[in-house]
Amino acid sequence: NLKEAVERHKLQDIVQVIRTGCFGFCEKGPIVKMVPDNTFYVQVKPTDAEDIVREHLVKGRKVERLLYVNPETNEQVPDSKHINFYKKQLRIALRNCGFINPENIDEYIARDGYVALGRALTEMTPESVIKEIMDSGLRGRGGGGFPTGLKWQITRKVKAPQKYVVCNADEGDPGAFMDRSILEGDPHSIVEAMAINGYCTGATKGLVYIRAEYPLAVERLKIAIRQAKEYGLLGENIFGTDFSFDIEIRYGAGAFVCGEETALIHSMEGLRGEATVKPPFPSEQGYKGCPTNVNNVETYANVPVILLKGAEWFSSIGTEKSKGTKVFALAGKVNNVGLIEVPMGTTLREVIFGIGGGIKDGKKFKAVQTGGPSGGCLTEKHLDLPIDYDNLLAAGSMMGSGGMIVMDEDDCMVAMAKFYLDFTVEESCGKCAPCRIGNKRLHEMLQKITSGNGTIEDLERLRNLAGVIKDTALCGLGQTSPNPVLSTMDNFYDEYLEHVRDKTCRAKQCKSLLTYTINPEYCIG
């Protein structure tokens, strides 16, 4: 509609309409951004296209009814730079999302795209590139937080005629859409980073494992790979060197366990997605038995900019042990739902109340779940906790891939733990008994408690079984699956007691614990 309106006013020779990736501010989408003046129009409908073109482009006047309104001051904010949601962020992995047409390689190149690859191939040795990544302090953004440069170094040191580089784009956490947004908004950054990884590790083949439910991300990735080949940035003798590298796409069926690297590799090989015992690690023996380096989308998105700006610049951002930024999918009972990127060390309070705009409808903050089904629920006492890998683990949660769900006073924490166990039981690969059977028993106990049939003894059994699963499950997904139960028991034990002792649910979410009475004064029918 915007293009049609531009053509109706005969402005097509001087005005471009560019479809970009996600701006991140999902609460206010769809969004139209006018450049160069950065006017930011929110919640735009197709019927608004004519007004935008006629008023803004022809008459030079802003369409005031479409401008963002600061809820605190009730004032219009025309420039996105002055909107709290954006001005408190630092975008590195998301640097190009919303700024370029992801289907146009020239726009990526105009923002220093493929410069890092060229520099690596023509000015640096594989060892010096790996050292730069190690010195930057970049850690895996998929949840484990393993040092990225060290993983590359391990893969490089293994002698083998064939090696592989894998991009894990299997994003299975409920409410998480970080990797999808990067692939939809900046696919060339992933192509470039994978080629750099291939150069460093000695791999000539790259594989992107992506769930088939991401059709737009898949389509834009295909376009990026094709364009890179046409420009000689993938294929034989890249940048006139003896380095050759190519990328293929592998599709996942949406199994949560396939986010675990060994299960992912099994799936790519056409086998059932099941985790395997480590060692051997994929870096030593992975896809088709060959050394395989696996990183996730967000990890790769940081690589080109580290080589461009230097390890010292990147390591100056964040905390002592967690460098750089982290992308989060901020969701739940918060005013500003969306995709955000903040420096490591930013507090939960700054994210939820500064960027997120606080709790919806003036309700009271109750908890925030970080790390998805593998994470934990943190309370008001954790709001000033600086976000990094170690702090979240110490608090009983984890970074995970970046899901962050905010809850208010109307949420039941016992029901929330049961919700995540629902997911875990459904998604278990079934290979090991602690996860296959143990989580089912956990879920049954939670079902018993929320149905009003729980006992005090059930609470002790619940905690004991959760601890056994955590200690004995085969893979990281199974080992972390009891976290929602353990963290809610640690932080909201009084709610568990109310469910089993008083048979009440303070949030009024557990229907079996609700009692309905008829008021005869009002029941006159």
Question: What is the predicted role of each segment?
Answer:
Residues 186-200:
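Histidine-anchored nucleotide/phosphate-binding helix
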Residues 118-159, 315-316, 321, 329, ...:
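Accessory "access/gating" subregions that flank catalytic or transport cores
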Residues 5-9, 193-195, 345-362:
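Short amphipathic, charge-patterned alpha-helical segments
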Residues 88-89, 218-344, 356:
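Hydrophobic alpha-helical positions that pack around
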Residues 100-115, 165-179, 282-288, 329-334:
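Gly-rich Lys/Arg/Thr-decorated short loops/hinges at beta-loop-alpha junctions or inter-strand turns
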